[in-house]
Amino acid sequence: MAGPRSEHSRQIERSAITALVPVIALVPFWLLALAAVWLPFWLIVGSPFWWFPVAYLVLGLALVIPTIQIALLGTLLGARKPRDEEVDVLRPTWRDLAAKANLPQTRYAVRVIDSDDLNAFACGGHLVIVTSFALTELTPEQVAGVLAHELSHHLGWHTAALTLGHWLSLPVVVLARFGFFLQNVASAATDSYATHSAALTALGRAAALSLTAVSWVFLAALYASDAISNLVGQSSEFEADRRAVRLGYGKPLAEALRVVIRHGGGERPIGWRARLAASHPPARTRVARIEAMMRHPSR
């Protein structure tokens, strides 16, 4: 009885734990970004700093509520409800998948993004996104394999740390962009109004340089967090593939990955920069592993 439960129920997998590493790396910069917002309030009304991170985290708890999460993330991602012809493919596919996973059909929502990319992904804790191009290019069986893989991300809690990381990164992104904006303002003001004074010109240049440096620090933190997330997150793809195989969707998932390969996707990254930027293992590697798991299901 233990085997089926581990395949079908939500269970925190190892990659869900390792996915916390980039989130932890981002926390100091998140706190610094909130400190920049807090400072004016402290100067005016003396607000304690801890109010801001606590309020921000409490606000983020709203994303745990499925209806809010689906509506908010769906809007931010530009996702929509499936059209009638897409429902004809997705409804029976999702119904069968939910039955095999012993889940109510309504626990997770499937949405569509209009895109020419052959892609699908899980986000939040209740949302599965598939592109319109994928629904056009893949057979219903292959779509089922892809959905089984994405559902497996949710069942393994792989998306929890990713959602938290995105939420924490928002103040960092805003502060970095605001810093670059102020740098442009400082440079423009220096060029327009301080050219007559060497001292004012030097002061303006120093201010612009300082703002640029601060902005790049926050931007570098985001890049580093994304790179770490990609490195530790590739194991979650293998774990989701494994669970999809155990649910009985190994063959259609492998076929869907072959379609990705035929379209020129899922290639092995060349060079360290490409490896840091790659969020998924090579598609051929995944196909080989899936086929090996189907040949030796006990491993």
Would you name each region that the model predicts?
Residues 1-119, 172-234, 262-267, 296-299:
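Hydrophobic or amphipathic, alpha-helical segments that drive membrane association/targeting
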Residues 94, 130, 149, 240, ...:
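Residue-level signature of catalytic and energy-coupling elements of molecular machines
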Residues 117-139:
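Active-site scaffold of zinc-dependent metalloenzymes
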Residues 139-155:
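Short alpha-helix carrying the canonical HExxH Zn2+-binding catalytic motif
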Residues 151-170, 250:
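Catalytic Zn2+-binding segment of zinc metalloproteases
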Residues 159, 163, 235, 239, ...:
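Alpha-helix N-cap and coil->helix boundary residues
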Residues 217, 223-224, 254-299:
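Long, well-structured alpha-helical subdomains associated
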